């Protein structure tokens, strides 16, 4: 008789979320740092692909232990629509934010001399409006032509798309099981979203991915502008609340518009009369 594998401890799950989130932030922000201060020549597609592959690698790293949420918006949506245990929510979110913070701090440490050299060459005073160009290495800020409301809408829409497709890719009842391919497909989706909508808001889609690095830049000398983005309404609120709303809309929309119409969803209801007739 085979025995079921033990469920990972909550500590182990949180550690996996910490490491997975840290890995994706390390690759993503490291790529942008290379572009901004080290003279690398990446285009939008290359940057988006690096972020996407970073997410895929992070999922492969952590999925077996924690489910690889790596995103508070995803955790909240899964709690509301997919049975994730609510008691784990604050621990997962804390681990995700901490992982993003530590990875951003590590990238900053590794590139610190290049940041200082770039600031001196460009006469940039850290904490000024001009310094947002370097703060954006670590977290997201909207295109200057966008209002805060427009940026909020962009983040809601792209996170809803992300969450709906995540639900589809991890739903074995929806077509062929994706299995080991799902992380790669999720990474490709992020790359496509980044290429299409990245210039508008930086495609945050993840409160931890944005808030953790923003906190790091605040402490590293950028000060309040790291959170406000130079806007009257502090911009840091947008990449927190818009992705949460978007993820919930995406997960709920998938359940209502797709999952309920799948053949597998109708099968149990159709099988029940068959049992009655056989009895």
Curated annotation (Swiss-Prot):
| Keyword Electron transport among record annotations | no
- Which residues point to the Cytoplasmic side? 1-8, 64-66, 82-87, 173-180, 258-279
Q: Name one GO molecular function term.
A: glycerol channel activity
Extract the CDD domains matched here.
MIP
- Which catalytic reaction applies to this protein? glycerol(in) = glycerol(out)
Supply the InterPro entries for this chain: Aquaporin-like (IPR023271), MIP (IPR000425), MIP/Aquaporin (IPR050363), MIP_CS (IPR022357)
All ranges on the Periplasmic side of the membrane = 38-42, 112-146, 198-201, 220-234
Q: What superkingdom heads the lineage?
A: Bacteria
Where does the sequence pass through the membrane? 9-37, 43-63, 88-111, 147-172, 181-197, 235-257
For the biological process aspect of GO, one term held by this record is: glycerol transmembrane transport
Segments carrying motif NPA 2: 206-208
Locations listed in the record: Cell inner membrane
PANTHER family found in the cross-reference section:
AQUAPORIN OR AQUAGLYCEROPORIN RELATED (PTHR43829), AQUAPORIN-9 (PTHR43829:SF9)
Q: What is known of its domains?
A: Aquaporins contain two tandem repeats each containing three membrane-spanning domains and a pore-forming loop with the signature motif Asn-Pro-Ala (NPA).
Q: What is this protein called?
A: Glycerol uptake facilitator protein
What phylogenetic lineage does the species belong to?
Bacteria, Pseudomonadati, Pseudomonadota, Gammaproteobacteria, Pseudomonadales
């Amino acid at each position: 008789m085979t025995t079921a594998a033990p469920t990972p401890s909550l500590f182990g799950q949180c550690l996996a979320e910490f490491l997975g989130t840290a890995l994706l932030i390390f690759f993503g922000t490291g790529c942008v740092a290379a572009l901004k201060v080290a003279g690398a020549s990446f285009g939008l597609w290359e940057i988006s692909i690096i972020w996407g592959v970073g997410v895929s690698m992070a999922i492969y790293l952590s999925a077996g232990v924690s489910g690889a949420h790596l995103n508070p918006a995803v955790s909240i949506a899964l709690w509301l629509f997919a049975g994730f245990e609510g008691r784990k929510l604050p621990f997962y979110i804390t681990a995700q934010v901490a992982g993003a913070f530590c990875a951003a701090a590590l990238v900053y440490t590794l590139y610190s001399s290049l940041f200082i050299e770039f600031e001196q060459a460009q006469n940039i005073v850290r904490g000024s409006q001009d310094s947002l160009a370097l703060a954006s290495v670590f977290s997201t800020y909207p295109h200057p032509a966008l209002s805060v409301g427009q940026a909020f809408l962009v983040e809601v829409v792209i996170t809803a798309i992300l969450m709906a497709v995540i639900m589809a890719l991890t739903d074995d009842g929806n077509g062929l099981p994706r299995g080991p391919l799902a992380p790669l497909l999720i990474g490709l989706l992020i790359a496509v979203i980044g290429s299409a909508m990245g210039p508008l808001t930086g495609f945050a889609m993840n409160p931890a991915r944005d808030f953790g690095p923003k906190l790091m830049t605040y402490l590293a000398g950028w000060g309040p502008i790291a959170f406000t983005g130079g806007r009257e309404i502090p911009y840091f609120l947008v990449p927190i609340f818009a992705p949460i709303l978007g993820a919930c809309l995406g997960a709920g929309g998938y359940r209502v518009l797709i999952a309920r119409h799948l053949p597998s969803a109708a099968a149990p209801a159709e099988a029940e009369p068959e049992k009655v007739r056989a009895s």
